[in-house]
Amino acid sequence: MQNHHTIFVCQETPCLSMGSGAVYDALQEEVERQKLKNATIEISGCHGHGLCEQGPSVVVEPDGIFYTHVQAEDAAEIASSHLRDGKLVERLLYHHPVTGKAIPRYSDIDFYRKQQRDILRNCGHINPEKIDHYVDQGGYRALRKAVLEMTPEQVIDEISRAGLRGRGGAGFPTGRKWELCRNAPGDQKYVICNADEGDPGAFMDRSILEADPNALIEGLTIAGYAIGATEGYVYVRAEYPLAVKRIHIALQQAQERGFLGNNILGSGFDFMVHIKEGAGSFVCGEETALMASIESKRGMPRPRPPFPAQSGLDGKPSNINNVKTLASVPIIIERGADWYASIGTEKSKGTAVFALTGKIANSGLVEVPMGTPLSTIIFDIGGGIPRGKRFKAVQTGGPSGGCIPAQFLDSPVDYETLAQLGSIMGSGGMVVLDETTCMVEIARYFLSFTQQECCGKCAPGRLGTKQMLELLTRITQGEGREGDIDILLSIAQTVKECSLCGLGQTCPNPVLTTINYFRDEYEAHIQEKKCPAAVCDALMISPCQHTCPVGINIPKYVAHIADGEYLESIETIRERNPFPAICGRICHHPCEGRCRRGELDEPVAIRALKRFAADWYFDHVSELPEPEPFPQTQSHKVAVIGAGPCGLSCAYFLAQMGYPTTVFEALPVGGGMLSVAIPDFRLPREVIQKEIEYIAKRGVEIRYNTPINVNFTVEDLKKDGYEAVFIAAGAQRSQ
């Protein structure tokens, strides 16, 4: 007899955008067409599985088989091969990005295996639109225990002993927050869930609402019981229609089952939950602005005190918690404070959920114990940086967070450590940046967002963010001036210390941390008018040319080769580099690392094309016009000491400028370390000799076996009429 299978088809926002709706319909049709009585098709919160770029995803339970990139046309094969014959569809399985090995079960994939999913415990394993699925997983047991077996004070004590801290910002102790609200005088109190989540690239709260809304409702109801509230609000963005839909369904089903409403579970406790759809204002993530929005006022922060626990929504004592905080409450009540406190660090307990995005192989939701090193999250779980790029920094905490450089990769992720590094935990955004990221531009990008979203109520937020943005924009456009960095630091510190709300106080973090850790990039923009990452358009023509150490016009010579104009190509290269054949063999080609084509598949083979053009030239040199010496338009003689690549390059360009130039070399051969250090199989000697002969033909005199020493000094060169001496003696010996 065939085992019964439950097929969970991701129906969350990312997978829906990739066509999972059609996959769901196709699987339904195939199960019916093939008359498979051993299969049930369910929608799921597979977005909570977290591996977003692998969607649309399908999970076949009870074995946990994970299919990726599933399309509607794959449904017939899944139904016939897997569901009917028991054979896995290997081409749709997840494959290890390095080894290419197929990994059938999602629990064996490093991305999942190295996580600890407590907050996301049900995401991807249940149908979020069926409360029975949640109940079957132990849902609402914690609520039953709280309202029937515990007093409100005992609930608060359990949360306090667990060490739960707010997962939406500064990490204020949740138990303490509840206690303050419970002890505040007043007959009417409110509990509010902040599900606004306005950070760009953050989708943790939305994922929980879409994949496991009952966990939030249960946590919110327990919070209401603990502080003595009879009403609660879920403040969610109207631009999250699927999340709004599923929280509505969950609320209706919870009320029908007696988990909400009057006399919950016969306990005498009454509690109702309302949904307030926000208009998408970032500042409404701040708790006082959020309450103003619920009151149908303009969402603007207000000074504190009084704090929300004293005077919040409608002037009543109110408690506001984040989605992840409330979703943690049921497991604490059910499993106990001691269990929860055993996870994490001494001051940061439990797990944290992060939205891992940016330049990362595996983007998605990650849940790990507090104190997990950044390196574990980024490399072991996230799979590292794609396309062989180098890790540069990670930005945590959303647009108000800081950028943490590579030297702190082994730092534990907890509230205290992130604060010491100049960043914040925030709502859990984690944007990975690689070597192609300009840190000045990233600071400008995040500040442009916070400046646009600033409510303008306080002068530091209204004017300070505008002034910082103007300075950063000026710097990225190549118009930065000396002193701009110090001005930025001064304004940022003022905004941080004087802003009215937490958003204003943290928005300078990207500026402060990028200056602190990447000041050299700011100085390059201002002093050299150069963007080291080749990102700022105003400071470059093309990324490859900008990155080339000698600034060769790479697009031009590549275009010449494409048109069959090989001589014009080599002439273009020699405008900036007299060694095209040598560099075509041994250059480390940083230009290819910045090639825009590499973002699609593979970079253009710039070095190989350079070698091709140079080899073509020397293969056809007898058919080409003989190179003529550059005309000598200057009367000042110049001596160059050393016939290595530096000395020969200097002599070549001096001759090009019209100066009579002579190179003095102690050895019997030119090329310096090119000739005496690089093996012949890597750089043939005849290639070096051809390049040197070309330089000599352009008018550079080279005198071998002529060391400059005590017997023949620089003063002797001056006596011989040389008015300038360039010393390119090299560094043959270690310091």
What residues fall within each predicted segment?
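Ferredoxin-type iron-sulfur electron-transfer modules in oxidoreductases and energy-metabolism complexes
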Residues: 1-5, 20-43, 62-91, 133, ...
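Flexible inter-domain linker/hinge segments
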Residues: 93-161, 314-315, 321-336, 540, ...
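Hydrophobic alpha-helical positions that pack around
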Residues: 114-115, 244-370, 382
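N-terminal Rossmann-fold NAD(P) dinucleotide-binding loop
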Residues: 647-648
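Glycine-rich FAD pyrophosphate-binding loop
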Residues: 659-675
